[in-house]
From Swiss-Prot:
Disulfide bonds: none annotated. Its main location: cytoplasm. This is Urease subunit alpha. Carboxylation allows a single lysine to coordinate two nickel ions.
C-alpha cells in the first residue's frame, strides 16, 4: 500500500523529513514512474480464472462485475444471477490472487430477490436496460441498495 509521498527517513538524524520510517518499512523508489496501489476493473465479465493473472500483469488488483464462467450469459452480462450462482462463483474465485466483488442482478420489482443476492455475498446490484430497467425495478433496486448500504451500477 502507498502510505505517503515525500522525503522519508529519521527526523532525529535528517533534516526536512516528511515521512517517518522504521526498520519494517519497505521503501520503493518511484522516480520517473507512475506508482499506484492497484487498479480496479469495475466492468468484468467473469469467464475464466486466467483473467486474474492477466489483470495482475496489467496492474489490476480488484475485479468487480459478474458472470458464471464460460457460458453465453457471462459474455452478455456483468452480473452473477441468483443465490445459487452467487455461492458457486464465490467458491470459484476464493483462491484467486486478486480481490473480487460480484454484482447481483438488480432489475426486479420485488425486494426479496435483491436482499437474497446481497445476503449471499453480492457487493452490489446491476441495473441494465436489456433486463427491463423499468421505473419500478430501478426504484426497488435503489431502495434496497440504500437499505442494505451497497452500490448500484447502472
Amino acid at each position: 500500500r502507498i502510505s505517503g509521498i515525500g522525503k522519508a527517513g529519521n527526523p532525529d538524524v535528517q533534516p526536512n523529513v516528511d515521512i517517518v520510517i522504521g526498520p519494517g518499512t519497505e521503501v520503493v523508489a518511484g522516480e520517473g514512474k507512475i506508482v499506484t496501489a492497484g487498479g480496479i476493473d469495475t466492468h468484468i465479465h467473469f469467464i475464466c480464472p486466467q483473467q486474474a493473472e492477466e489483470g495482475l500483469c496489467s496492474g489490476l488488483t480488484t475485479f468487480i462485475g459478474g458472470g458464471t464462467g464460460p457460458v453465453a450469459g457471462s459474455n452478455a452480462t456483468t452480473v452473477t444471477p441468483g443465490v445459487w450462482n452467487m455461492s458457486r462463483m464465490l467458491e470459484a474465485v476464493d483462491d484467486l490472487p486478486i480481490n473480487v466483488g460480484l454484482f447481483g442482478k438488480g432489475c426486479v420489482s420485488k425486494p426479496e430477490a435483491l436482499r437474497e443476492q446481497i445476503e449471499a455475498g453480492a457487493v452490489g446490484l446491476k441495473l441494465h436496460e436489456d433486463w427491463g430497467a423499468t421505473p419500478a425495478a430501478i426504484n426497488n433496486c435503489m431502495n434496497v441498495a440504500d437499505e442494505m448500504d451497497i452500490q448500484v451500477a447502472i
